[in-house]
């Protein structure tokens, strides 16, 4: 397989919709364009997982991605885990499609011999390490997220460090919603790393339309 570019949207929210378009419908359109949409819902202490679970799961399902509900102290490791799991899921999907083309539509990774399956998984792991990755981070900056944004910023730095340990190239971009003048506003344009994230921290504040 040729090394390609995986495109992801990472939505970080409190799981309660604001103004604007239906997020599930937008996720569906993105997925149809080949972009995986992952969603992380951040809970307030004392709030049950079930209260924000439905919307978060629905958006991720429509976007063909992964979803997790966490408290803010677990956000950093969850951001990294979800991003990497989504990469693995997408790559396995590509590999399974290639196998179907070669071996027939009924064939899948589980249908081949253990030895061949091990070889296939080696290919998946290699592609995870070498493929190019573009992640557009979409951060909910509604008033309810005010006490979580500092943790979000730290998590994005950790994500950049983690992904840049791979040999494949990475590009990141950060948008916020709701914006002050529009539903969605760009905070940080495409860059290979987020180590200079502090430069746009002042823009990533709660509040908006």
Regions flagged by a language model, labelled:
Residues 66-75:
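Short acidic-hydrophobic, aromatic-tinged amphipathic segments that line or gate anion-handling sites
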Residues 16, 142, 146-148, 202-207:
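Second-shell loop/turn segments in exported
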Residues 47-57, 171-203:
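Short beta-strand-loop
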Residues 82-136, 143-148:
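Acidic, polar low-complexity linker/tail segments
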Residues 1-3, 127-128, 163-166:
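Surface-exposed acidic, glycine-flexible loop patches that form ligand/cofactor-binding
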Residues 2-6, 13-62, 70:
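VWA/integrin I-like adhesion module and closely mimicked acidic/polar interface patches used
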Residues 50-53, 79-84:
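Short secondary-structure transition/capping segments
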Residues 8-12, 131-188:
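Von Willebrand factor
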